[in-house]
Amino acid sequence: MKDKIIVKGAKVHNLKNVSLEIPRDKLIVFTGLSGSGKSSLAFDTIYAEGQRRYVESLSSYARQFLGQMDKPDVESIEGLSPAISIDQKTTSRNPRSTVGTVTEIYDYLRLLYARVGVPHCPKCGKEITQQSVDQIVDQIMELPERSKIMILAPIIRGRKGTHEKVLENIKKQGFVRARIDGEIYDLTEDEIKLEKNIKHNIEAVVDRIIVKDGIEGRLTDSIETSLKMAEGLVLVNIIGEEDRLYSEHFACADCGISIDELAPRMFSFNSPFGKCERCDGLGTLMEIDEDLVVPNKDLSIRGGAISTWGDSRMKEESWTYCVLKALMEKYNFDLDTPYKDLPKKVQEVLMYGEPEKLKVTYTKENVTAVYNHSFEGEINNLRRRYMETNSDTMKAEIEKYMSDNPCPKCKGARLKPEALAVTVGGKNIFEFTSMAIREELDFINSINFSEKDKIISSQIIKEIQSRLSFLINVGLDYLDLARKAGTLSGGEAQRIRLATQIGSQLMGVLYILDEPSIGLHQRDNDRLISTLKQLRDVGNTLIVVEHDEDTMREADYIVDIGPGAGEHGGKIVASGTLDEIMSNENSLTGKYLTGAKKVELPEERRKGNGNFITVKGAKENNLKNVTAKFPLGTLTMVTGVSGSGKSTLVNEILYKGLNKIVNKAKDLPGKFKEITGYENIDKIIDIDQSPIGRTPRSNPATYTGTFDIIRELFSQTQEAKMRGYKPGRFSFNVKGGRCEACSGDGIIKIEMQFLSDVYVPCEVCKGKRYNRETLEVKYKGKNIADVLNMTVEEALEFFENIPRIKNKLQTLMDVGLGYIRLGQPSTQLSGGEAQRIKLAYELSKRSTGKTLYILDEPTTGLHIHDVNRLVKILQRLVDGGNTVIVIEHNLDMIKCADYIVDLGPEGGDKGGTIIATGTPEKIAGAKESYTGKYLKKYL
């Protein structure tokens, strides 16, 4: 019993009463077509139950913070361990999260810098030493004669609590006053009640002195008292100046600057003791961006160059026009000159204002008057309104014209100057985290510590080294620890969490992973597989939902789920070792593994239509002044190892650059010199894996526009006409036809305190979303709720005589989505499914033959059989004269390209150049190309 996990009667989603035995402490791959039920079995059944049982064992107090898991629809699961899921969805979007903080390496670094860091003066850069009482007295005596000062002992600094004992203690030592959170209190008279959950500063007032000759003795006593009370610190409050902090520990004798005792919190950009005060520790500031305020500098002011000004402002009777008239008289320009040709001074005044008051003549209701007006400029105006408004809508509106820029104070380093002045091995903590991970490991290994520092740091260094090594082993050596977590791809984020788990060295755990090979080049795949085996060998069970052939060949056990997708899936087709799967007649996966089935090579490679889109001088992120040519009328793949610059070139520069030129979009592209050849395309479409909608109200029928036609069809029925129902009656988003008890959701959310929220079908409409009257209207015997509950395949048969609906549904069938329901909430669709719905929507439109489609790893989540289908669809788009550019690692996909742009040679700093371009055959012959090396086997 102990060596197996036994699942009996799983019925979650489309699973058909599945029973299964899988070995423990092995590497198990779940595979099958997209939508066959792999995730339902791995995540929604096995993981959900493992997690639920663990959480159930905790107290109800702890459970309210964790959220209770629902019990999955399964009869029983035996042999379960506590389960940890490592999926793609849980990347932190918090701008404060970095690779360093997510992997916890940054915590060890803070400790390292606090314990063995060498402090320097932030002003002059000299190494800082401790200050004696005499030095402190001498510096105070240099203040102007008759300066009023207060000597304070900083006892509590930024700590939560009521601190009653501390205040009592100060009183007992004979002090009558204390400064609490910046205010002076009389300890004998005032009743002081401090808020328990707020951080406080408490300083005892030791002495109040006027600086003059002869006070040195008294000053020395007061400073010694303060140093004793506040563990080596004294705070001098000078009337009309900033407080000065002196320390018998660290201070610069030349500049008179003291810094706090080194502590880990000083290096945290989330702590008030470490973060840069200007940007609040984010490293960037949102600023109004002139390129967003004036996106098209070829336009004139009258023609709409300043995008924040509507047409009404250009009417001659408007106030803005009268102000502009006064500016025109002063600077001699007109409103019809293209913005780029206006003198620099005029552009500056329009954006940042006119220092002198203008005489503005303005007529309102036949009364003309002359006003003295200060013109503040459009950028200053937006900035002021942003600071003053309390309206979230107004803020969101103005944020459209803002972009993130490095903070001018910390230059993006996020920390205070004092923290950045501390070095280990000659580098400060920001310089260290900005290096690529492989360089960081080399640097850590090369530091020469003194004997004392070696003893202090040995344990910390060991932890940092092992964690950096794990990141390198999962193929992330090109990242840096300062990289924001929100900018990572799903695959990168998942592999970081994988590295963190290996670092935790747990055993006896059930790990469930969702396609860890996503975004990984074949070259790095071997390292990933050995990492997975390492996790298994420690004594863990790994269930990996995966389509990657290499991973399957290395697995101990494979479970093939199918045979089809959706309604046609949900059964175990085959399970066993690699050989057993390959010899199983029923297994589609087995047929591809043996080579009986494969993705066929195209009969010929297209040459394109002779036109190119060329990106010149691309320099964003790690791109090294790259010039890339993309032939139009072809299927082009952009390849290269992880971190080589593919996404930067295609998404940040090509897509955003063209989007700005062709669609006048506001998104700022990355750095490049120019893009040529764009006149040969009329549309640019990015088909990504983002959800088709954020709420359960959006679904495949609404996204593809099918639902509008279906509602129209229902409103044309005899019954609907008699009742006077229009198409709006059949919408679940507006009042009229929908069930008002659940507002057309079909379910009602019941909030539970200690348990997870419960969703129950609406009692009134029984989950059908519509009221009784609406459901009485039928088309071919089915009401609108029945239609929404049909799969695409069923609906195609049902509506075969309605060409407008049939065409849209046929494209959904073509992309392999016959199994999804028309009304399936978008929140229940995977990224791959969302992407294919978008593809189907594009296929159903009339092609202009001049569209450029961009896809980023469309094979994510696709079984090799689905990849075969996808290739055919993309070829169909190109056959219509369009151009498709795909970022891809899947070699079955790459071999079908007409043209390849291969980036490399490595990731990060060692990447960012074009290694080879041309047909797959040409790439396979390129010596430098890693892609070519692996592609040879597929051609």
UniProtKB/Swiss-Prot annotation:
GO CC terms, sorted: cytoplasm; excinuclease repair complex
Location of this chain's protein in the cell: Cytoplasm
A GO term for molecular function: zinc ion binding
GO biological process: nucleotide-excision repair; SOS response
Positions annotated to bind ATP: 32-39, 640-647
Keywords associated with the record: ATP-binding, Cytoplasm, DNA damage, DNA excision, DNA repair, DNA-binding, Excision nuclease, Metal-binding, Nucleotide-binding, Repeat, SOS response, Zinc, Zinc-finger
Keyword Repeat recorded: yes
Domain called ABC transporter: residue spans: 309-588, 608-936
Pfam families in the cross-refs: UvrA_DNA-bind, UvrA_inter
SMART domains: AAA
Zn finger region (C4-type): 252-279, 739-765
Family the entry assigns: Belongs to the ABC transporter superfamily. UvrA family.
Assembly mode: Forms a heterotetramer with UvrB during the search for lesions.
Name this polypeptide is given: UvrABC system protein A
Organism: Clostridium perfringens (strain 13 / Type A)
Chain's gene name: uvrA
